[in-house]
Amino acid sequence: MIGHSTQEKIEKLVQSCGCNLYDLLLLKENERSILRLYITKEVGVSLDDCAMVSDLISPLLDVEDPLAGEYFLEVSSPGIERPLKRPAHYQHALGELARIKFADKNEIEGEIEAADETSVKLKGEEPIPYSLIKKAQTFYRW
């Protein structure tokens, strides 16, 4: 687990590149430990942005060493179909389509019309408290 102090330092470095830290995940895939950073930018994230963030963060991670042992650092955009985990994610996705799943396995889809610190509202629906949401993500109707 990455400590709060290290995460704040990562966030400041990402912001110094003109980007925002969207999410930070520690995971294992095929026996490999991965530290995955998702970054966003108003005009879209380029490969150069990802490389710049990676180059800035690598020395910090060498000193802070958030994971015991070897790991891979990945920096990318969260993509067009991205998870919605925090109120800020919903607020930045206003006007986009979202799929929301509840603990009882029901789900709802719709355009995000409003979002605040406690709930999200899809067009034509009542506000949904975040506490009722098990999983949510934006989606694109192809």
From Swiss-Prot:
InterPro entries: Ribosome_maturation_RimP (IPR003728), RimP_C (IPR028998), RimP_C_sf (IPR036847), RimP_N (IPR028989), RimP_N_sf (IPR035956). The keyword Cytoplasm applies. Keywords: Cytoplasm, Ribosome biogenesis. Its main location: cytoplasm. It is found in: Cytoplasm. Signal peptide: none annotated. GO terms for cellular component: cytosol. Belongs to the RimP family. Required for maturation of 30S ribosomal subunits. This is Ribosome maturation factor RimP. It comes from Wolinella succinogenes (strain ATCC 29543 / DSM 1740 / CCUG 13145 / JCM 31913 / LMG 7466 / NCTC 11488 / FDC 602W).
